[in-house]
């Protein structure tokens, strides 16, 4: 505590305007204002106050005059009190509260809530503030907590400094004006009001809003504390004017009784002669004991009616204000000393106590000498100057025959009476505590009974609902599992079939490319043979012409000779014909020999093709196994990566094919050059054909070796994936067993709330899995669309190539037929070449027909796959809708469960509220230098100067 100082109570007088009833009644406006401090009622005497506020005064002006300075004093460590006094309907509640959320019409209390924080944010940044508020009312002379309506009869106690306080009152820590306003709104909703003839919203109780501010300097550790009482008194009433009856009349009696007790306290303090001030006559005066004549800066706002109808009450109120103005309060700063200061004070008091003990001992020795009849010389007598220089004497006991000092009788009686009075007051406080505890216990037990009944009924209903919902969800879960299994199986089949078809398409494309290469080679050979054939035809035509000319000449000669010789011409013609027939027979024999060789080559090529088909079938089987393994792998890998890999592989294949095409074109050019060089002999061509067949066999062996290596790698990968599938299946079985155990435990346990939470979590996990499966399905659908587009493009290009190939073949066949018709009797070499080309054409037509059949098979398979894809899409949509419904049901169940848990928590909190009336709360420290954050409920310790803010949590008990 700092050194005390004396100050008087400030009294402000406020007159309200005439209300509608007074204007309609024609009441006269009686006050006359003389300056800012004097008012005269009618023709009476003047009343002087610290400030007189006329009816046109705004709420802000009232606040600046009455409360602004007190806020600064409280933040400097003083106690403060502001209360409004006056008759009913005189504007007390309007002055103290006003319209809470209207910036123009809000009263003193909400303005103080904002002004406190404005002052704090402009103060030194090293200060840290803890602000807590409480709100209670005195109704029927019982203290009722407005923040906890279950506390209906609280007791008033005194702390170690004999300062009264309300025991058990709810205290809320606040850190922003919004939180203070929330507390005010909550408390105001619980306050007692009633309708009377003079006021539609008449307060039926005295309300007290207490703000407790503690501040600490984090550098110097200096601690200050201040309390601010904001009191809205209920107005005094005349029953003849208010028309109160029944419960309202009882309330009016208690209001007038407590206000008369307040008047008695003011009168006793104003006279200054009475030794006893009746603070204990009412609980309101007991709470305001420190505000009236104690350690507090107090401002009283007396509210008056200007109507002549209320002239007597107005004069009584003004007299009350004049008496209160004479009261003196002794105020001091509430300074909490630090440990070092306490230590210094203790040492100082210890030294003082030591010197006083020495003085007492010397005085007792001197007194003992006087009582024994010994005269003590003046130089040995102890004076006030010598007290500090005394040495401690021996601890000699005081003699027993010292006569006790008898005090005055009046002092003993006074002390005795004071002790009796204090003991009676203590008994009274104990009885109040006991009554309060019993009443709270009774209400608590009643509430517990109601809560238990309601809780039991609700838990039964909820248990039945939860059981029904659980069975329904189990059925839906099983159905969903079956559908998911079917969808997965269908997707697996679809993926396997698609991979097979894609592999077949790739094989066909490769075969097609090979055939196109062979076709290009054959076309080149065909063009060369056609050129040779044209040259031979020209030569044969020239020879025919010469032969015909020679024959004609010979025939002429023979005819001339035949005229002379009769039959020789026929013989010569027969001989000529015979020679021609021999040549034709030789050519036919040579052609038949070539045909037999070509047939043997065709049979050998067919055998090679059958072997290649077998290897292709084996390769397809291994590729199907590989596709199945890749399907299992693709379920665990991202489709995007696989697509990018696939595109890269396709790009590499395209580049390889382009490179191979370039190399083949180069080889083709070389072969053309070789063919031009080796056109002389047909045997060289046969050798080249044999070398090509050997190269084909070597390529086939290399392909078989490559496929064998691929097959081994695929087999290893398949075994590894099967092991992973077995492990996953074991994990699934373990999870299923765990789920069954949890379900069995759920049927046995009495409380189902935690189990429902676990089931909700499992349901969410399943939903997430289904969502992942759905995402994978969507990715697979997109991949399938992309592959379908690529397949369709490849098929289109193949179809176009087929058309071009057929057209080219038809044109060439027509040309060859025309050439055959033109040249029926060519040479044997020409016929051999023609037969060779015919055989090649037959092989090419067979290959083309096979490609057409494969294309038709693929087109037949395509609608089946599309149909299966549509079915899977519909099934997935149905699963999505079922999943959505299950999710919505789960959300509804969770909300209902959360509401039930909140209701149970509220019931338990209401049951245990009385038990933990003084339990620990989290304080919200405030530091100057910053305005509060956007969230009003956030716990912030704010430093000034734009520094960083750090969260700080303090626990107060």
Swiss-Prot record:
Keywords: ATP-binding, Cell projection, Coiled coil, Cytoplasm, Cytoskeleton, Disease variant, Hydrolase, Microtubule, Motor protein, Nucleotide-binding, Transport
Binding residues for ATP: 87, 89-94, 99
Primary residence: cytoplasm
Sections of the chain in a coiled coil: 406-923
InterPro entries: Kinesin-like_fam, Kinesin_motor_CS, Kinesin_motor_dom, Kinesin_motor_dom_sf, P-loop_NTPase
Signal peptide interval: none
Region named Microtubule-binding: 174-315
Pfam families: Kinesin (PF00225)
E.C. number: 3.6.4.-
GO cellular component: axon cytoplasm; axonal growth cone; ciliary rootlet; cytoplasm; dendrite cytoplasm; distal axon; GABA-ergic synapse; kinesin complex
Region (Disordered): 911-957
Enzyme class: hydrolase
UniProt-recorded Gene Ontology molecular function terms: apolipoprotein receptor binding; ATP binding; ATP hydrolysis activity; microtubule binding; microtubule motor activity; plus-end-directed microtubule motor activity
Cell compartments where the protein resides: Cytoplasm, Cytoskeleton; Cell projection, Dendrite
GO biological process: anterograde axonal protein transport; anterograde dendritic transport of messenger ribonucleoprotein complex; anterograde dendritic transport of neurotransmitter receptor complex; axon guidance; intracellular mRNA localization; motor neuron axon guidance; mRNA transport; organelle organization
Record field: catalytic activity: ATP + H2O = ADP + phosphate + H(+)
Role of this protein: Microtubule-associated force-producing protein that may play a role in organelle transport. Has ATPase activity. Involved in synaptic transmission. Mediates dendritic trafficking of mRNAs. Required for anterograde axonal transportation of MAPK8IP3/JIP3 which is essential for MAPK8IP3/JIP3 function in axon elongation.
Quaternary structure annotation from Swiss-Prot or TrEMBL: Oligomer composed of two heavy chains and two light chains. Interacts with GRIP1 and KLC3. Interacts with TRAK1. Interacts with ZFYVE27.
Family: Belongs to the TRAFAC class myosin-kinesin ATPase superfamily. Kinesin family. Kinesin subfamily.
Disease as annotated in the protein's UniProt record: Cortical dysplasia, complex, with other brain malformations 2: A disorder of aberrant neuronal migration and disturbed axonal guidance. Clinical features include intrauterine growth retardation, fetal akinesia, seizures, microcephaly, lack of psychomotor development, and arthrogryposis. Brain imaging shows malformations of cortical development, including polymicrogyria, gyral simplification, and thin corpus callosum.
Protein name listed in UniProt: Kinesin heavy chain isoform 5C
Taxonomic lineage: Eukaryota, Metazoa, Chordata, Craniata, Vertebrata
Gene name, Swiss-Prot/TrEMBL: KIF5C
